A protein has these predicted regions:
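A glycine/proline-hinged amphipathic helix-loop "lid/cap" segment
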Residues: 1-68, 301
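Alpha/beta-hydrolase superfamily serine-hydrolase fold, recognizing
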Residues: 16, 20, 60-64, 71-301
Length: 301
C-alpha cells in the first residue's frame, strides 16, 4: 500500500506540475520553462553547505565533482535527468548527497548541453568526454554509473558505447525511471491509458522532438533499449508503476535477461517518475537504501 505522502505528492504533481510541462504550456518556449524550473529548484531546495563542489572545464560543458567530508571508498558517475531539455541541480545534489553518505562516495556529474539549443548527439558526446575525464581520477572497478529519466537513457547509451569503444566499464549501473525507447515501439494502449502524475503523452513527444531534431529514433545511441546487453556490469533498475515510461523499464529487464546479463529490478506500486528524488516519501528512502545496498554488494564494501 503506497504511503499517504505518496498520495499527496501524486495529487500535487497532477494538478500543479503536470500542467506546467504539458498541453497547457505547449506555446511556451522550452527555454522559458527551463528558467522557471531552475528558479523553483533554487528557491525551494537551496544548497547543502557541507557539499564541496568543483567545476572542471571540458570542450562544451563542465564536469562537476561533489565531495562530502567523509572517507571515500567508491565513486559515482551520475547523469541527471530532465527530459533532455531541463535540469534541477539542487534537487539532484540533495539526492546525491544522501546516496554519497550511504555509500561513502564522491560523485562526478556531467553538466551536459541541453536541447533544443543542442539536440542529439550533443548530450551523448558531452557525457562520453566527461566519463573519460572521470577515469583519470578514479578506478573503474570502484565506479558506479547512475542516471535517471533522460539521464538513464544517456547512462545506458554510454555503457553500450564504452563496450563498443573497448573503454573501461564501471563496476555497476543504477537506472531510475529511464527513458529508453524514443522510437515509442511499446504497447500503445498501455501508453495512452497510463495515469502518470507528471507527464502527458503530448509533453513527452515535445521533449522527444526537441532532442531528436530529425535524428533516427531507432538508433541504438538514441534508444539504447535496442542494444545488446551481453557482457555489461550488473544493473539495478527502479521505476514507479504509474509512469508513462514503465514499459521501457520492463522491456529493459526482459532484454538484459534475454542476453544473459545481470539485472535487479524494483517496480514500486503507485510511485511517480523518478520517485527516489522526493525525500519526504518513505518509498524514496526505501529505494535509496536499495541503491546503497546494491552498490555495497557489487563493490564488495
Amino acid at each position: 500500500m503506497p504511503s499517504w505522502q505518496a498520495s499527496v505528492l501524486n495529487r500535487l504533481l497532477t494538478y500543479v506540475a503536470r500542467p506546467s510541462v504539458s498541453r497547457g504550456s505547449a506555446k511556451v518556449p522550452l527555454s522559458a520553462i527551463r528558467q522557471r524550473l531552475l528558479e523553483m529548484d533554487r528557491r525551494l531546495l537551496g544548497w547543502l553547505p557541507e557539499l564541496k563542489v568543483e567545476h572542471w572545464p571540458l570542450s562544451h560543458s563542465p564536469l562537476i565533482h561533489y565531495q562530502l567530508p567523509q572517507p571515500r571508498e567508491v565513486s559515482l558517475f551520475y547523469i541527471r535527468g530532465g527530459g533532455f531539455c531541463f535540469k534541477t541541480p539542487h534537487a539532484h545534489a540533495r539526492f546525491l548527497a544522501d546516496i554519497m553518505r550511504r555509500s561513502l562516495a564522491d560523485c562526478y556529474v556531467p553538466d551536459y548541453r541541453l536541447a533544443p539549443e543542442h539536440p542529439f548527439p550533443a548530450a551523448c558526446d558531452d557525457v562520453l568526454e566527461a566519463y573519460r575525464m572521470t577515469l583519470e581520477h578514479c578506478d573503474p572497478d570502484k565506479l558506479v554509473l547512475m542516471g535517471d529519466s533522460a539521464g538513464g537513457n544517456l547512462a545506458l547509451s554510454l555503457l553500450l558505447q564504452l563496450k563498443q569503444l573497448e573503454l573501461p566499464l564501471p563496476r555497476a549501473c543504477v537506472l531510475l525511471s529511464p527513458a529508453l525507447d524514443l522510437g515509442i515501439t511499446g504497447d500503445t494502449e498501455r501508453i495512452l491509458a497510463a495515469d502518470d502524475p507528471l507527464f502527458t503523452v503530448e509533453s513527452l513527444l515535445r521533449l522527444r522532438g526537441a532532442y531528436l531534431a530529425g535524428s533516427n529514433p531507432m538508433s541504438e545511441r538514441v534508444s539504447p533499449l535496442y542494444g545488446c546487453f551481453k557482457d555489461l556490469p550488473p544493473i539495478l533498475l527502479l521505476a514507479g508503476t504509474r509512469e508513462l515510461l514503465l514499459q521501457d523499464a520492463e522491456r529493459l529487464q526482459q532484454a538484459v535477461l534475454r542476453d544473459g546479463g545481470r539485472i535487479e529490478a524494483g517496480f514500486y506500486l503507485n510511485m511517480p517518475h523518478v520517485f527516489p528524488l522526493f525525500e519526504l516519501l518513505p518509498e524514496a528512502m526505501e529505494a535509496r537504501g536499495q541503491i546503497a545496498a546494491f552498490i555495497r554488494n557489487n563493490l564488495l564494501l
